[in-house]
A protein has these predicted regions:
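Active-site helix of classical SDR
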Residues: 12, 46, 54
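Alpha-helical segment proximal to the catalytic Tyr-Lys
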Residues: 17-18, 59-63, 121
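Residue(s) in the substrate-gating loop at a strand-loop-helix junction
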Residues: 30
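Short, flexible catalytic-loop segment of classical short-chain dehydrogenase/reductase
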Residues: 34, 51, 72-83
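Short C-terminal tail/terminal secondary-structure segment
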Residues: 35, 112-113, 124-138
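Active-site loop immediately N-terminal to the catalytic Tyr-X3-Lys motif
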Residues: 35-41, 63-64, 100, 118
Length: 138
């Protein structure tokens, strides 16, 4: 929790003094916050906490005109993947998604750009799922 949730809480607390109406906060959660994962219980728990923090903060800051949203990536290729998994798991990474592949970082980035833009001026408390078609509730 120290890394994944406390850091967001304290960073947000420090940044709020400098934010004006029209500002946007975008947090990163994960598909595991919605699906769970028996091997990543600690990680899934922190990502679920980020989701709840995002929604609660959005309701808290709406009257100040500050939007708060999240992005929940699914399996995305990063240097962490080959460093964390054995070769067999790396070869199959993302293949269980409806699109049958893992995403690339450049496929996630536009979600952040959208949420930061004025095109999302009426969007707050929401989470965009960039996960190759895995439909999750919540």
């Amino acid at each position: 929790f120290r890394t994944n949730i406390f850091s967001i809480f304290y960073l947000t607390k420090a940044a709020l003094d400098h934010m004006k109406e029209g500002a946007s906060i975008i947090n990163t959660t994960s598909i595991t916050a919605f699906r769970g994962n028996p091997m990543l219980m600690d990680y899934a728990s922190t990502k679920g906490a980020i989701l709840a923090f995002t929604r609660s903060l959005a309701t808290n800051l709406a009257d100040q005109g500050i939007r708060v949203n999240g992005v929940a990536p699914g399996p995305i290729w990063t240097p962490l993947i080959p460093a964390s998994f054995d070769a067999d798991k790396v070869a199959k990474f993302g293949s269980d998604q409806p699109m049958k592949r893992a995403g690339q970082p450049e496929e996630v980035a536009p979600a952040y750009v959208y949420l930061a833009s004025q095109d999302a001026s009426y969007v707050t408390g929401q989470t965009i799922h960039v996960n190759g078609g895995d439909i999750v509730g919540g």
